[in-house]
């Protein structure tokens, strides 16, 4: 990364960082896509089981990753402020937190989740598939969190092409393992939907292996000496990471868990509706890679400019990110509307299920426009390390507004589609409030056009 002067130079740097991130995100989300489609091709019960299992894993995955991603703006600001020597300790303390969280999460999976599954409104077969799916995921939870720290470290330096290469190397391996474990090919046990969990868990370890190799062989990464001895646990650094990470993680948790809650509530409408909801939701997740990548890019660039005390440049990057996100939202909405029948065909050959999926996809268009506004705002706020209010806004918007609206509409002629209208309502409310917040945050940051000093 480097300082830029013109809008043209900023667009170029934005796209240089954004493009590898979006390829990485699309590839990562394709793992969920292939888990869903390959499980659906095995059976509707397998698809429903993976949907329920994912409804547990997705919010935890996203929330804990969001917590660990706190090192991205921290390191980006350190780089901008020319304090590179502090980077190694930041990464190490992030790894300490990651391993602790992994241990806690594995305990919860084996001690708490089975009890929850027995009380859910789904068949015993679907619950059993979900349980084994999550057990498979647990194999790779430590690796997943370690890789989240390493990926954040690499991205915060603006070296997003490296994480792209890591992901591109590992996802084909995941697809191959899905083929083996779900369908029992090449002498592997036929595990159905649960097999996709084991495939994903094993793949996470490959991600760590490839990450370590690249960090050790790339000069721009090796110079930080991340793997040259362990630094001491610093409670001040732990406090900084948690101070940013917890609100950030809660924001993501409130957003992803609301989708998981809706998946569980869909159980009242039957297995077929759960399967259709999960299929359409996996498409939305895939498309969400674009606005999410805009947010990640703004966190990196905004953090870098904030560390260098250049508020004007940080604001200009936010404007660029907003323009890019709105354009992406329009394109994604058009894809969902005009190609919904083709998309549904990827998931099932059942006409009734295909019709349900197409209906969900129409309502998903609303998500695209809400995310186009919300994602860049969240990314900018993370770059400024202003994340406390976002978690409060997320809880109110999603759980106190979005879910009640959706629940009420589900008793009308809209049925299960009412939940998706409720979800969209929550996203729009959050986007509106946080758009005001980011402007106020920028007003509070005092910068001198030359030396610039930030005051919070």
UniProtKB/Swiss-Prot annotation:
One Pfam match: MatE
Localization: Cell membrane
A GO biological-process term: monoatomic ion transport
One GO location term (cellular component): plasma membrane
Top-level taxonomic group: Bacteria
InterPro entries per record: MATE_fam, MATE_MdtK, MdtK-like
Membrane-related topology note: Multi-pass membrane protein
Ranges in coiled-coil conformation: none
Transmembrane segments: 13-34, 54-76, 95-117, 132-154, 161-183, 193-215, 244-266, 286-308, 321-343, 358-380, 387-409, 414-436
GO MF: antiporter activity; xenobiotic transmembrane transporter activity
Sorted UniProt keywords: Antiport, Cell membrane, Ion transport, Membrane, Transmembrane, Transmembrane helix, Transport
Family per record: Belongs to the multi antimicrobial extrusion (MATE) (TC 2.A.66.1) family.
Function: Multidrug efflux pump.
Name of the protein in its database record: Probable multidrug resistance protein NorM
Gene source species: Listeria monocytogenes serovar 1/2a (strain ATCC BAA-679 / EGD-e)
